[in-house]
């Protein structure tokens, strides 16, 4: 398979368990993808995919799509169904009072740990961890990666 490039608007199919799958979409700012809130065994059109609620938005390593682990199955231009890229947080592991909130361009501002509650830690996700997060969501259980990376309140 030819190397797949990051192209905003591209819809990706994520195999969840060998029987069912979810969908993600490449967003305007590399390497962010929106993962949609549906695990199914049905094939959805790109228009049906972008009509679904977004479950989460995370940056992912290129290994997820470069060699076809998450194959491209269509595209919907970003302008037709925009998805906002959320802010993320960073927290110093030795001084948990030292936090920053970052936008999708990497611009940072100081923040308190309390301001970071509800935000995801700034990290690039492996395909396997996104797939595990989807399985955990489907099984209605907490995801270890999400729990481990939550902001530490002091």
Describe these PLM feature segments:
Residues 55-154:
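Beta-strand-rich cores of mature extracytoplasmic or soluble domains
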Residues 23, 44-46, 70:
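Aromatic-residue detector
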């Amino acid at each position: 398979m030819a190397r797949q490039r990051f192209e905003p608007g591209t819809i990706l199919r994520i195999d969840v368990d060998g029987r069912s799958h979810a969908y993600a979409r490449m967003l305007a700012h590399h390497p962010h993808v929106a993962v949609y809130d549906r695990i199914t065994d049905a094939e959805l059109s790109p228009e049906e995919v972008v009509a679904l609620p977004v479950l989460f938005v995370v940056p992912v390593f290129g290994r997820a799509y470069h060699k076809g682990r998450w194959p491209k199955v269509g595209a919907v231009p970003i302008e037709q169904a925009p998805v906002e890229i959320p802010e993320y947080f960073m927290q110093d592991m030795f001084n948990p009072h030292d936090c920053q909130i970052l936008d999708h361009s990497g611009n940072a501002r100081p923040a308190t740990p309390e301001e970071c509650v509800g935000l995801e830690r700034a990290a690039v996700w492996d395909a396997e961890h996104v797939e595990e997060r989807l399985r955990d969501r489907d099984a209605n259980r907490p995801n270890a990666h999400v729990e481990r990376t939550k902001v530490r309140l002091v």
